[in-house]
Amino acid sequence: MSFVTKRNALISALHKAVGVPVLLASQVQPEAEPPLIVYSVTADYIPDGGLGNYSLGEGATQDDLVEVREEQPTATLSFTACSVNRCYDDKGSQVQVLGADEALELATLAQGFFLHTGRDAIAGAGFVVVDVTDATSRDALELDEMGRRFGFDVRLRYTRTDAAAISKLEKPTIKGNVKE
């Protein structure tokens, strides 16, 4: 399973857990209405310094050999919960939403997913949580108002597998004299 496939499964599970859109940052589609979470992959491959584990496997046919290399690097994803101050009508009464409070609660809920509640979904996506940072303010000025944002980073470990077809020698060709 590729890193992107694993990441998409993880993001889908997070979306189900928090109940708001979880969107990849810096995309060209219009941004959803708040509240929402945006994420970015700040590092998709941080090796641990090892060479990996090598093994031989069978290829497409019985005569093909494949050399398989596996390792367990880490990846860092950054999550930012976004909201704005706003009012809405709830059955005839005005309700005021403080964007900073909503963004912090959403960031805390997402942190809880990585710290505890989402452990089965995280493992099912092929990741193990290594570290979760604290949620800090990432407020940003949006035209005429402040976009209230709280964000945190998550470091995840996953298994990376690379495979390469290799040739095998049926009968070596020996040139020159062989001394016994």
Predicted regions and their residues:
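Small/polar-rich, solvent-exposed N-terminal microdomains that initiate assembly or binding
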Residues: 1-66, 170-180
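Soluble non-cytosolic domains of exported or imported proteins
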Residues: 1-5, 97, 101-104
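Outer-membrane beta-barrel proteins
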Residues: 67-69, 142
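Histidine- and aromatic-rich ligand-binding microenvironments
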Residues: 36-38, 153, 157-174
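Acidic-leaning, charged glycine-interspersed low-complexity segments
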Residues: 105, 112-162
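Residue-level signal for secondary-structure boundary sites
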Residues: 47, 87-89, 160-164
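A broad, low-specificity signal marking well-ordered, structured residues that form hydrophobic/aromatic
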Residues: 36-37, 77, 127, 152
